[in-house]
């Protein structure tokens, strides 16, 4: 049985879903693609650990999630999503760089499609992928949220801290 929980965050309402504690879905409530909730059961106490980690992330206190995930997609999509998880907090990569990383040079557009189908936003950091020119491009939650997440990470990134911070 799939359980879900909706929580508030600095970027709006987030819905977490899966078989607690294993997360299969994390989306912004008003995101462009919303999965069917047929057969889902609301449980306001589910995913307590994930919610706690998200709170720490938004407070700038957590740079790496430790949440059990069940990523379902094609083999190519899962390769892309695993590559996204290697992008360090506070950094970005281009679609082309991800394509190279997974051994599919020239597949930047396919990487973009896989990135757009990422079922677990924020934890699988699809917001860290940008265009080759450095421009912010597509994000299911909206470019304003993508910019907010990247700014949050830059502000709290270990690389941005100095000895006197």
Swiss-Prot record:
An MF annotation (GO) of this entry: methylated-DNA-[protein]-cysteine S-methyltransferase activity
Regions annotated as coiled coil: none
UniProt cross-references to Gene3D superfamilies, sorted A to Z: Methylated DNA-protein cysteine methyltransferase domain, Winged helix-like DNA-binding domain superfamily/Winged helix DNA-binding domain
Compartments where located: Cytoplasm
GO CC annotation: cytoplasm
Gene Ontology BP annotations: DNA alkylation repair; methylation
Main location: cytoplasm
Active site positions: 126
Keyword NADP in record: no
Chain's role: Involved in the cellular defense against the biological effects of O6-methylguanine (O6-MeG) and O4-methylthymine (O4-MeT) in DNA. Repairs the methylated nucleobase in DNA by stoichiometrically transferring the methyl group to a cysteine residue in the enzyme. This is a suicide reaction: the enzyme is irreversibly inactivated.
PANTHER family hit by this protein: METHYLATED-DNA--PROTEIN-CYSTEINE METHYLTRANSFERASE
HAMAP family (alphabetical): OGT (MF_00772)
Record's protein name: Methylated-DNA--protein-cysteine methyltransferase
Biological source species: Mycolicibacterium paratuberculosis (strain ATCC BAA-968 / K-10) (Mycobacterium paratuberculosis)
